[in-house]
């Protein structure tokens, strides 16, 4: 019996466009950004801001140093939002209309810029925020851990009071799905931007 549904952000609730993000960061003058930005796990300063080792002001200062000029919060936010080619509003309608009997959680490798956006009235046309659709968000930049670190999943299960066998996890990252399954969590790996509603309906019928 499934009681909990855990969703990733990028690739699952957002359609990702890595090339646009690379273009925007390059336009800011950040060198070698293609070596640091990855669809699933970042490296360098981009990893440090995602795993909480670096604060947003520290990250902004580091990128400014790389670019050789002062970058603003809005400069970097605009570049990061290149990743988010589309927020799939219909998926939030699905969560609201069909998943009301389940506990909804977010587990995401993300950064302060994206989290600020998710909690703003710009997130969806309705003005609703991400938090209004879920019981709790487990954001890497706030938790100090990134997927596929086993500890991140174990912390989520503990703090969310979830039983693995009662949990369904959606993530577009192969290593993340593999770790979830290793812990006994039911998992599905959608393609970037996939409409996974019918698949979730099917899985819930099979697992319930």
Describe the residue ranges of each PLM region:
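Generic structural signal for small/hydrophobic residues in well-ordered secondary structure
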Residues: 8-11, 52, 106, 137, ...
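Short amphipathic alpha-helical segments and helix-helix/interface helices
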Residues: 92-96, 106, 153, 177
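N-terminal helical cap/lid subdomain that shapes the substrate entry/recognition surface
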Residues: 2-89, 100, 111-115, 202
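Catalytic-core regions built around general acid/base machinery
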Residues: 90-101, 133
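Proline-centered loop/turn at the N-terminus of a beta-strand
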Residues: 103-105, 186
